[in-house]
Regions:
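Transmembrane beta-barrel strands of outer-membrane/channel proteins
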Residues: 16-22, 61-65, 113-117, 172-176, ...
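Residues that define the transmembrane beta-barrel architecture of outer-membrane proteins
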Residues: 24, 35-43, 93-98, 152-156, ...
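Long, well-ordered mid-to-C-terminal structural blocks that present hydrophobic/aromatic surfaces
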Residues: 207-284
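Surface-exposed coil loops of outer-membrane beta-barrel proteins
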Residues: 72-101, 108-197, 201
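Outer-membrane beta-barrel biogenesis signature
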Residues: 1-15, 34, 119-133, 142, ...
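Residues on the lipid-exposed face of transmembrane beta-strands in outer-membrane beta-barrel proteins
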Residues: 45-51, 99-104, 115, 158-162, ...
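Beta-barrel outer-membrane channel/assembly domains of diderm bacteria
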Residues: 1-111, 160, 317-318, 325-333, ...
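Repeated loop/turn-to-beta-strand initiation elements of outer-membrane beta-barrel proteins
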Residues: 12, 55-59, 109-113, 166-172, ...
Length: 356
């Protein structure tokens, strides 16, 4: 065998797939293409590559295309969207090199340094059961902290991690920002040290009765000026949060999140979510996954409503073959925008996946 080809087979891996979603609303419509529509849809193929050029070093790249219709959050009907896969107008219908970064492990894998381009949520607020809208829950508040997610973007970054003692992992991260929630924006490659995102996270990963778990405490600062909700002037964006996941049996896991964000600049100063993930719930369907979760977003009292928007979601991911999956998903939103007098919104969705 040719040595070059043998080296590539050993050091390079490729993965890819395509996800398609169709979501139907009840008691809600959005204006799209000049008409009121009661549905949204999305299709998103991607290609991922990992190359290990040196020992304990890896280069990761992800190319993704997403085409979607508008959703409820984009039209200001809910505080958090019901289809997290959707992207905004800037990226809709474009092929994007979302991630391209290098990671070098150090000190016998007790530390690492990473740099390149990715989103902060590659490292922050992760969760074993509620973190991937392509395979798990689909609504934003059961995928990430919505306020962190709204500030998050794919941009140049540097991250440092260390494991000082067993089961404790520490991380610091700095990232260029386009100032996504400011009245004026900049390019992510322009003045990268100008009011960047800074974040830190501590993760405790114990084994409880032989079952893996992760308990994360994180904080972040978006250092550009945000318009104040409480009066004239500006303040920095910041937030702190917990993201927890714990296997309790071989096939059942629990998760929870809670976050507090600067109440002077964000529509949602408090957020929480809890849920369960079960493999093989149906007899003889060991590779299927069932998920059930509930989340709450407390509306800021300085906005028109001050109630709590509640999201309930259930999905069942059916394995048809090694490469094909299909997932019916149901969501219900109580008190949209924190308005206790508003009619609830029901959404049913079907997701199809092909992966290789």
């Amino acid at each position: 065998m040719d040595p070059t080809w043998e080296y590539l087979q050993r050091s390079v891996s490729l993965q890819g797939g395509i996800v398609a979603n169709y979501q139907q609303y009840a008691n809600a419509t959005v204006m799209d293409d000049g008409e009121n529509q009661d549905f949204t849809a999305c299709i998103s193929p991607q290609l991922k590559m990992t190359w290990e050029p040196v020992e304990q070093g890896s280069l990761y790249a992800r190319l993704r295309y997403t085409k979607n219709r508008v959703d409820l959050a984009q039209k200001g009907i809910v505080l958090a969207n019901l289809l997290e896969t959707n992207v905004g107008d800037k990226d809709n219908g474009r092929i994007r090199l979302q991630k391209l970064y290098y990671t070098q492990k150090l000190m016998n894998e007790h530390a690492f340094v990473a740099f390149g381009k990715t989103d902060g949520e590659t490292y922050l607020d992760t969760n074993a059961f509620a973190n991937d809208s392509r395979t798990q829950f689909m609504g934003q508040p059961l995928v990430n902290n919505p306020m962190l997610d709204d500030e998050d973007e794919y941009a140049p970054f540097v991250a440092l991690g260390v494991t000082p003692v067993r089961d404790l992992h520490l991380l610091v991260l700095g990232q260029s920002s386009s100032w996504p929630l400011a009245s004026q924006h900049k390019d992510i490659w322009e003045n990268m040290l100008g009011h960047p995102l800074a974040a830190a996270q501590a993760t405790f990963s114990p084994q409880l009765n032989g079952h893996e778990g992760h308990y994360r405490l994180y904080g972040w600062l978006q250092s550009y000026d945000h318009p104040s909700l409480t009066g004239p002037g500006y303040e920095k964006g910041w937030g702190i949060g917990l993201s927890l996941d714990q296997w309790v049996t071989r096939d059942m896991g629990l998760f929870a999140r809670v976050g507090h964000n600067n109440p002077h600049v964000y529509e949602v100063p408090w957020f929480w979510s809890v849920g369960i993930s079960v493999r093989g719930l149906v007899p003889r369907r060991e590779e299927d996954t069932f998920g059930l979760g509930i989340s709450g977003l407390k509306a800021n009292p300085d906005t028109p409503h001050d109630g709590t928007e509640i999201h309930l979601e259930a999905y069942y991911r059916i394995r048809l073959s090694e490469h094909f999956f299909v997932s019916p998903d149901f969501q219900y939103v109580l008190n949209p925008l924190g308005n206790n007098d508003e009619t609830g919104i029901f959404a049913s969705m079907l997701r199809g996946e092909f992966c290789f």
